[in-house]
Amino acid sequence: MTRYTKLFSALSAKNEGAFVPFIMLGAPTPEASLAIIRTVVAAGADALELGVPFSDPVADGPTIQRSHLRALDNGATVDSSLELIRQIRKEFPELPIGMLIYGNVAFTRGITQFYQEFADAGVDSILLPDVPVREGEPFIAAAKQAGIDPIFIAPAQASEATLEGVAQHSSGYIYAISRDGVTGTERQSSTRGLDKVVANVKRFGGAPILLGFGISTPEHVRDAIAAGASGAITGSALTSIIERHTTGTHPEPAQVTDLEALTEEIFAFVKDMKAATR
């Protein structure tokens, strides 16, 4: 069993959903991102979705775009991200770790090497948000060779062919989006029609469904699970908390103003979001 299959099996036995926070590696600083990750795990996060900073994050809204810049301004690289992942895996050997990384990173490092490096660091899954499933063949092959679960996005208004491809080729979980567009709480998630989104994806079978994009409140999490999803992913709402405790304007390196206050607020937020999965 993989870490994902163990997780979803254990949660199902408890009649719980999964809460998965998204965190940008190296943002606002490497040390702060590690402290944030330790905090979300202590608060009850079931798995992690980690970002590798990239200079042109087209699938992300303004909040997460700024987190890419904060990490880059503090010197984050793919290699430094891999080092952080190795540390996280050492501390949390059973925790599923998923990555959200732009496809250009894979091309730059070489697709086979890219997947093997992240597998060796302890990663369970990789989602390339700018690579649709119809273009996924070389990535799927390299991921499977390295023992990584390839994840694809199931868009809210996807064609049947796309949904069938996502269900067929995603393992670990399926990232279903509650609405089309970019990530972020700048456009709040509408929970109306979530059951139709989930049912549409489920028609083709496949891995458990996690809902994302605009999930920012416990009510959103409850609605996602009530709609039939196995859990929810939250990124921009958590990133906004981090941003409120950060100084510095791009391209100046950012700093955390009060790490204790930041981690306390994050702990409370994640605890409430996880409670909504029960």
Curated annotation (Swiss-Prot):
PROSITE patterns: TRP_SYNTHASE_ALPHA
Keyword presence, Lyase: yes
Organism: Corynebacterium diphtheriae (strain ATCC 700971 / NCTC 13129 / Biotype gravis)
SUPFAM superfamilies per the UniProt record, alphabetical: Ribulose-phoshate binding barrel (SSF51366)
Root EC class: lyase
GO CC entries: cytosol
UniProt-listed InterPro entries: Aldolase_TIM, RibuloseP-bd_barrel, Trp_synthase_alpha_AS, Trp_synthase_suA
Catalytic activity: (1S,2R)-1-C-(indol-3-yl)glycerol 3-phosphate + L-serine = D-glyceraldehyde 3-phosphate + L-tryptophan + H2O
Stored Pfam families: Trp_syntA
Family membership: Belongs to the TrpA family.
GO molecular function: tryptophan synthase activity
Name of the molecule in the record: Tryptophan synthase alpha chain
Quaternary state and interactors: Tetramer of two alpha and two beta chains.
UniProtKB keywords: Amino-acid biosynthesis, Aromatic amino acid biosynthesis, Lyase, Tryptophan biosynthesis
EC number from the UniProt entry: 4.2.1.20
Pathway: Amino-acid biosynthesis; L-tryptophan biosynthesis; L-tryptophan from chorismate: step 5/5
Signal peptide segment: none
Location of the active site: E49 (proton acceptor), D60 (proton acceptor)
Described purpose of this protein according to its UniProt entry: The alpha subunit is responsible for the aldol cleavage of indoleglycerol phosphate to indole and glyceraldehyde 3-phosphate.
Top-level taxon: Bacteria
